[in-house]
Amino acid sequence: MKIVGHKGGGSSVPENSRTGLEHALSLGLDAVEIDVWPTADRKFVLFHDADIARLTGHAGWTMHLTSDQLRTLEIGSRVSTEYTGERILLFEEALDMLAGKADLFLEVKRTRHELDRYTWVEERLSQILHECNALAWTTVTSFDHRSLLNLHEASHDVRIGMLYAGEWLSLQQEIDALEPVALLPHWAQTTPTLVKDAHSRGIAIYPWVVNDNEWMQEFSRMGVDGIITDRPEALIQLRQATARPIDKTESEGSHD
């Protein structure tokens, strides 16, 4: 079972940041999940929100600013003064950091009412993944399945992961069209039946966002392929405990 750091390295470090990715790599995580937004100058930056206010304290919309404008903004001090000076990353910078070290789940963000304005997004994203030789270890995800279909049509080489928070049975036509390698359901919609049905079709399951220890254990027993979490350290401990071989003397002593 893979451990996937949500928004990079989990909630103990600035989200979608260089420090977050460095933290994930230092933990030896199998994969990270990051968010990217397209910018006004047709680039991609690591950022979660449509509005920049929560992380930067400034007013503005991510899609309406250039990458240079966004990279002047500080995003670390709201987590801790230890991270003051943390800057927004370009997508290519993140790919360079992760190459050969961890797999990537890439959530593409875009406001629905501006889909027609940003028709270049899927083709450019496909180009970057090809240019950076990142196709084999990157899965592109989105709640916007129309965007995923555009990406799938732009390049069948891109690995698709479907994010959703609804019912599995309502997605069958979209699954047939998108041919995803993974489904990323909300943890509350993740059931043994879903895992079994998806696996029968060769589709991996990665529930999000799982932060409770008991649910981590439950999904591990359920046989999911990985867990997306804000608490990767806790999941590492769980996986290590589960994998620890039983000492013979401990086994004998258990019958006392």
Task: Name these PLM-found stretches.
Residues 1-256:
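Phosphate-group recognition and catalysis centered on beta-loop-alpha active-site segments
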